A protein has these predicted regions:
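GHKL (Bergerat-fold) ATPase N-terminal catalytic module, capturing the glycine-rich phosphate-binding loop
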Residues: 1-3, 7-117, 125, 148
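GHKL/Bergerat-fold ATPase module in large chromosome/replication-associated machines
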Residues: 46, 64-86, 106-116, 121-383, ...
């Protein structure tokens, strides 16, 4: 903090002088993309293919320093730039192979508090938010305290003493829960993840795991809440699923992944087919996103129908919370989605004195009955008329 710097180092293969100039000295050059093109026949999962992510550091830093030593080389090189007048290359001293990136953080202004990025807990929060599921460990030396060993023999007037020490701590989880097989995760683990991630106090009514390879490659972990949020039927409610690209968060709530009638669903989608710096405008036109949307729509519908058939009591509780949204979906857009949603609808049957589906009503119709009869009023009003009659 005193030096206003963030130092990030790896233990990779490093870069030569020529590679530093090519990869960092050329804006929008992507070594990752070149690597994928050179190995297009292999199944490679790699992020960062546009070459502009590195330069986003200038949003918080007024100078970047990169020191790298390539594998098999005896010399190290330093690349440095203020983001204005090119860059400078100089020989450097580095004992180990790999790369170190130093961000020289900007001084605070009246409108921006850049020193927040130097706070230890702030850095941990940023890593947990955006890179918790990157499959490689992100470690940081953290200052901690512990009690010193007690002397032996211990004096009568002994008072415990504490000392500070630093410990290398892995900040990210690395293995996303949604990439595990459902058989490898307990219900308690799913429930705990849901409540921690989405701030709910109750367990979800349904956990949906979806994994697809082919035209659309993605992993999804979805949750049907057991109760509706307090602001669900207000303009303040935001639908959407957390969208990740190869384990890196690119959007907290991607509304385009869910139709309005399933807006109550919460969850996460992780796809290898999306780039890290894709914009909201590009997402709306992205063909992969449309494929994922269609697949999730079908999956959610099937899971809700399975709940209806296999756990009727739980489905009726779900219907009390979100049935209005399903009915609105069947009615809206001139009934465009009625065919998809009709098997999920429940109605109160005056004769049966319980909730029934349309199919259940039809199955019990007398042979001579040709129509479904209904009263377009609330059950309370209907009971009032029955009493008068």
């Amino acid at each position: 903090q005193r030096q206003m710097c963030i130092r990030d180092r790896d233990n990779g293969i490093g870069m030569t002088k020529e590679e530093l100039e090519q990869n960092l000295g050329t804006i929008a050059h992507s070594g990752s993309l070149d690597f994928k093109k050179d190995n297009k026949d292999e199944n490679i999962d790699i992020i960062g293919q546009f070459g502009v992510g590195f330069y986003s550091a200038f949003m918080v830093a007024d100078k970047l320093t990169v020191i790298s030593k390539a594998y098999g080389s005896d010399e190290a090189w330093q690349w440095e730039s203020s983001g204005v007048d090119g860059y400078e290359m100089t020989p450097a001293q580095k004992d180990t192979v790999g790369t170190q990136v130093i961000l020289h953080i900007k001084p605070d202004t009246d409108t921006e508090k850049y020193d927040n990025f130097l706070d230890e807990y702030g850095i941990v929060a940023i890593v947990k938010k955006y890179s918790d599921y990157v499959r490689y460990p992100i470690q940081m030396e953290r200052e901690k305290s512990r009690q010193k060993p007690e002397p032996d023999p211990k004096p009568e007037d002994y008072k415990p003493e504490w000392e500070t020490y630093t410990e290398l701590e892995t900040l990210n989880s690395m293995i996303p829960i949604w990439k595990k097989q459902k058989s490898e995760v307990t219900d308690e683990e799913y429930n705990s993840f849901y409540k921690d991630k989405f701030g709910d106090y109750a367990d979800p009514a349904r956990v949906i795991v979806s994994r697809t390879e082919g035209t659309a490659n993605y992993n999804a972990l979805l949750f049907v809440p057991s109760h509706r949020p307090y602001d669900f039927y207000t303009k303040d409610y935001e639908k959407g699923l957390a969208l990740y690209a190869s384990g890196v968060l690119i959007m907290e709530k991607c509304a385009d992944l869910l139709p309005d009638y399933f807006s109550f669903v919460k969850g996460i989608v992780d796809s290898q087919d999306l780039s890290l710096n894709i914009s909201r405008e590009m997402l709306q036109k992205d063909s992969q996103l449309k494929l994922i949307h269609n697949a999730l729509e079908k999956k959610i519908k099937n899971e809700l129908h399975a709940m209806l058939n296999n756990d009727r009591a739980k489905y009726e509780e779900f219907w009390k919370e979100f049935g209005r949204q399903i009915k609105f979906g069947a009615y809206s857009d001139y009934g465009m989605h009625a065919e998809l949603l009709r098997d999920l609808l429940l109605f109160w049957s005056a004769k049966e004195q319980k909730m029934v589906t349309l199919q259940e009503y039809v199955d019990k119709m007398p042979a001579e009955q040709k129509f479904i009869y209904f009263a377009a009023v609330s059950y309370t009003h209907l009971r009032a008329h029955e009493t008068k009659a």
